[in-house]
Every structure is written in C-alpha cells, then in structure tokens.
Design a protein with these regions (language model features):
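Metal-dependent phosphoester/phosphodiester hydrolase catalytic core
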Residues: 1-190
C-alpha cells in the first residue's frame, strides 16, 4: 500500500491526517485520497511513500467556506499545452506564485496526436518541434496513459502541480481533436 500524510506545515511537524491507499494496475497505478476534517481557506502539505521511496512534497489550499465572501481571490489559468510546441517554462513561473488560491486548467492538458511535419513561423519558414511525443496518435487506454506520463514528466509542470491545487476540465484534445459526440473525424475511435 501507498502511505500518505497531510500536514499543516511544510516541514511535516504537525501531521493532521494519514492513511494508506492501494495503487491498482487497472487505475494506472494511481491513488485517489479524500481527506476530511481540514480547515477552510488555508494551505496544507502532502506527501506519499511506498516503502523507502517518498514523493515530492506537494501543497494544496482548501477552499473558503461556501458562506464566506473573500475580499480577494487570485488564481492561475492554464491550458492548450502541446508538449511538441515548446517547453513548459511558464509552469515554473506559475509554481513560483505564492499567493494563488488554485489553478484552473481549461483543457487540452495533452494533445492526442503526433505532429506529422514541421510547424511554420510567422514568415512561413519551417520550424521543427522542440520535443516530440512518444508514439503516434492515441487510440487506446495504453496510448493515453503513455501520453499523460510523458507530459507529467516535465519538471516545470510537476512543480506547478505540486505547488497549487488544480481544477481541470476537459476540452477536445483529451479525447480527440474537434471531437463532438459520435463524429470523431478519424477512421478509428479513441
């Protein structure tokens, strides 16, 4: 089992919740933990351990009470991040923002297809991608898991995700470009 801890301080001197969860292969060896009893509108720190291996420390901020009326709410916004189009240095800047309540990610966390040729700059000259997707297009669960793992291997993205609570939503590329209902626009559905 994976052990987890939540603390009220970044050095884990005051542990406020602990537990264990099983990382199942059918769920991509991931765990989902719901922690109760936390105070509203404040940061907490968390970490995971499996045997002697320990995760990077993360920070999450709880929401204000539903009845609260905060005088100010500052949050980050991100989306449409194509791994092949550039480095994720903007996420490092987001990670360095200390006073964000959360990050809202409006979708296109991944791009499910591989670029087939060069992009073009403003003068119409070909420009190679900065880095390349592993594999081709995503068609099955294994393809999508590999693509997410590749995106999540970026250190700047890891830093931003460890620093702030995230509220993501989906757009088309999490499924397929321009996907609408039964009209998938490709020969094989994801």
């Amino acid at each position: 089992p994976v052990k987890w801890e939540v603390a009220s301080d970044d050095r884990f001197k005051t542990i406020v919740a602990t537990g264990e969860a099983t990382a199942r292969p059918e769920l991509g060896h991931s765990v989902h933990v719901e922690v109760t009893g936390l105070q509203p509108d404040r940061p907490y720190w968390y970490r995971f351990a499996l045997g002697s291996d320990q995760s990077t420390r993360g920070r999450a901020r709880t929401l204000p009470l539903a009845s609260a009326s905060p005088a100010r709410l500052k949050f980050g916004v991100a989306g449409c991040q194509n791994y092949e189009d550039g480095l994720f240095t903007a996420f490092r800047h987001l990670a360095n923002e200390d006073d964000l309540a959360f990050v809202y990610h409006y979708g296109d966390f991944i791009y499910e297809y591989k670029q087939r040729g060069p992009d073009y700059d403003k003068d119409g000259l070909p420009v190679d991608q900065v880095r390349h997707h592993v594999g081709l297009d995503c068609y099955d669960l294994a393809d999508y898991r590999l693509r997410y793992a590749q995106y999540l291997s970026d250190y700047d993205l890891q830093a931003a995700r460890a620093r702030h609570s995230w509220f993501p939503t989906f757009d088309d590329h999490e499924v397929q470009n321009n996907w609408v209902s039964d009209n998938d626009g490709r020969d094989q559905s994801p």
